[in-house]
Amino acid sequence: MRAVLDACGLPLAAPSANPSGKVSPTRAAHVRAGLAGRIEAIVDGGACAVGVESTILGLDGAAALLRPGGVAVEAVEAVLGVTLVAGGSASKPTAPGQLASHYAPGAAVRLDVVVPAADEVFVGFGACPGAALSLSEAGDVVEAAARLFHVLREADQIAGPGGRIAFAPVPEAGLGRAVNDRLRRAAAPRG
């Protein structure tokens, strides 16, 4: 991507590389699967290092967190020297990714599962014997954020049509807040 920007010599803006409401792409193959036949080319810079999208703030009053993302809330608060207030809502979104149901796979998603049902694809975090997949076997929220959408897509493929996915609990600290935000939206009822 750096080579494309250097060759362009101008500022470059591009739309999101995924259909609205679907699981975000973090690899070129994800973009190809989601936008096949609708785009001319894909610039493949490798897997996204951060995984979850950007942190979005509202600064038109008290500093507000509109969407937790790849920069932990604690880091933003340390730089700004203030505690962020909650901002935005699913009923009146003011930033991307605020709809109640978003980042949704085809399979139903259940959260904070310790003992999965026999018909669920179990996605672990930390030590989770029997998990089909893991956001981070080491229990690292940074790794979980980087792997989230790729693992969600894999679990959806394994679950198949009408299937179910169960996610082990992920701590809310650091990037865990962004991971849990995306998981709650993936698990929300779809309208």
What is each model feature region?
Residues 1-191:
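Active-site-adjacent structural elements in enzyme catalytic cores
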